[in-house]
Amino acid sequence: AMQTMADISSCSWGNFGMRDLSSEPRVALNNTSAYGNNVTKSYFNALYSVLTDSNTLGFAVANGTDFDNPDQIEMVSKLGQALSIGYLALVFDKVWISDETGAVVGAGLEGASSYKEAMTFALGKLDQAIAIAKSKNLSLSETAIPGGGGSNASLVQFMNSMGARMLVGNLRSSEEKASADWAKVLTYANAGLTNDFE
């Protein structure tokens, strides 16, 4: 449904809310609990599930749980926090932020933060994950990421590519585009992936 909403593809049916999200002129999103197309609900719930698991891992590391490789677990925790909060910020106007220390209360409704604040937080977590991976020369197993994508070099490049992608993807207006930190985007991109996946 998000592809049709972005005019990337089309569909002859209204499956998964495609018609509702992609009709033009745009119509208001049906945000009631009775709405049958759960395209945003499933996305929302899945990303908060990843965030909860990532926070639990981070909490365990911070409180001395015995792991074979606590640095690797901490890096995975920070990466999970970054990607879940970052991708929530790409889609929603408000994000409820939390990490291993608990809720990070924003000024919005029921403690929500704006998408800009959420992305700033997510990129901070991503930068922490990159720093841990680089300083500890961490990698992930072939089982976790097949095809060599879990090597330290590939992992660091992947995280940098995600930073560039999230930073640019979060721009929602011409004004935001004009004031974006393009130097940071370039720094991420230059340290990112240069090869394609097969």
Q: Which residues does each PLM region occupy?
A:
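Acidic, glycine-rich segments characteristic of secretory precursors and extracytoplasmic regions
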Residues: A1-N15
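Structured, solvent-exposed acidic/aromatic patches
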Residues: F16-E198
